[in-house]
Amino acid sequence: LVGSEMCIRDRCAEYFPGLMSRISGIGVSGVQKKAEEIHAAAWQGATGVLPMGGFYKSRKTGETHAWKAQTMHMMQTACDRASFDLWKQYSARMQSNPPIHLRDLLAVKPIGDPVPLEEVESITAIRRRFVTPGMSLGALSPEAHKTLNVAMNRIGAKSDSGEGGEDPAHFHPEPNGDNPSAKIKQVASGRFGVTAEYLNQCEELEIKVAQGAKPGEGGQLPGMKVTDLIARLRHSTKGVTLISPPPHHDIYSIEDLAQLIYDLKQINPRCKVTVKLVASSGVGTIAAGVAKAEADVILISGHNGGTGASPATSIKFAGLPWEMGLTEAHQVLAMNNLRDRITLRTDGGLRTGRDIIMAAMMGAEEFGIGTAALIAMGCIMVRQCQSNTCPVGVCTQNEELRSKFTGSADKVVNLITFYAQEVREILASIGARSLDEIIGRADLLGQVSRGAEHLDDLDLNPLLIRVDGADTVVYDRDRPRNTVPDTLDAEIVRDAARFLQDGEKMQLSYSVQNTHRTVGTRISSHIVTKFGMRNALQEDHLTIKLTGSAGQSLGAFAAPGLKLQVSGDANDYVGKGLSGGMIVVRPAMTSPLVAADNTIIGNTVLYGATDGHLFASGRAGERFGVRNSGAKAVVEGCGSNGCEYMTGGIAVIPVSYTHLTLPTKA
């Protein structure tokens, strides 16, 4: 709830338990007045005509939209002609809109006297702080997706692959030197396209816990957008709608999130891990837990956005402004001495250099530019991304419409350059020489009157708090990633040196305990790096024999050529993201237990698996095979919700008739 007086919040607590509001404002009389205005507009008599409204699509006499046709055209022309003068006209026009966002009610205070522009942080350095957020190949056309990657790589910035995986053909630079691969690879609840190879082709891995445009929902790709290419990359079937689960089925607590972060840092020993959160009340507490789970970057995503995988109702009615989530996360992290362990990033409607400055003052070090990047490539905001009928080839898989795509990497480079150039000029005007000088300086923001009672009643002070100790935080985006302890694989990698160097077939044996987590994952990273995913290794080229109880995530993302053989049992997440390896789990020879009657592997087995084999002499726990899209498995039973959201693979689960209760005749 945003912008209500205390009395309304107290009443809401009675009727809507758990509802929170950080921003106070309108009272009961204001609500009554608004209701009367809406009623009067709807009941104009027999001859009255209802207004068009313009809620979804911009109308001249309807609701104000930030992205008006003339404004978009001006920005596109600026990017096409590389004209900063036109960009400044666009920025001025955008800022002349009536107040739409919370930041529109704020003004920037100077640090001191203006400084010469040449003394300010360079455009090149500022550009590296920008990111194009996760927009999948599927939501976007292949041309648009590739263009964003190439553009951001040219300037040392980052693009995000989104949820749908990435074409392996893009993992290598093109003949002209352009790099079409995203530096950030996303891991979402559907785990589409997530393989050991994919996870090793990046500088950063992003766990999408939620999306600002549709918090609480998984990605949704209509069947008409699932082409042969999309189906191949996502390990699914052409023409079949793909819906990701609302939650990650391996994240039901902050400890589970810590385990996934650990898994990702094992499969890619070089990358940082980002956790994408949605702006919401209480996000600060979540951010503190994420920081303690050894994440490196936290993204606070605002409610704007959505590119064809978000229902229109969610885009309009769900989520909160990034200003609220970002300030809360920054404040809580600073209060708990966690802020200098994390890089904060935000996105969700950053349209001008002024927005970037305000986001920095609220605590952001990096900035996501999504919708504006699409507009620079030609998007005209017809708002039919989900229908596969984008007339300019940005958000469609229709080949005829894709041929109309006129975007280029140069246009996106110009866009990010203009953002950086405007930021640089504003920094000089307020007496700052770098963005680092103003990050977290919410005291440099002040609320201003907009001459409207319903706006001036809003109390934005919760956004403007500068907590004790915030002035001692050192903002270092280049710090090494937060380290995680080694697993048994550190020993395996040393012992398997001949296999990794010369491809020698080997068999290694170890005693395993439940404290040995993610066994087989680090060695899989080495296999993918050395031999590739489509290698000529035999399925048991490197066999690891384990005796005992294996910890969580046994064989996570196990690569082709690796066989893990356990005599004992294993905890949760066995074969998570299995990518071609083989896992065999059987009871110890001395075990008196009947295999078919007892659980031998834990919950959420084969979650997001894309290839490989699992054989378990015993039962699996809950959520077995959820989102399996290619692995073949044999188990002797499983708990509830088994094999849900599967798009491929085979699961054989023999059941003894002695376990069934057959109906009797009446």
What are these regions (language model features)?
Residues 4-41, 311-457:
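Active-site capping/gating regions of soluble enzymes
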Residues 159-162, 297-300, 366-369, 565, ...:
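Short hydrophobic alpha-helical runs that function as membrane-insertion/retention elements
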Residues 199, 204, 212-345, 354-366, ...:
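Alpha/beta enzyme core
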Residues 127-138, 239-248, 266-273, 307-316, ...:
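Glycine- and acidic
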Residues 473-660, 666:
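Long, distal/terminal scaffolding or interaction modules
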Residues 1-10, 658-666:
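Conserved small/polar residues in nucleotide/adenosyl-binding loops
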Residues 4-9, 164, 171-175, 217-222, ...:
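Short acidic, glycine/serine/threonine-rich loops at helix termini
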Residues 4-232, 409-428, 432-542, 550-554, ...:
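Conserved, well-structured core domains of diverse proteins
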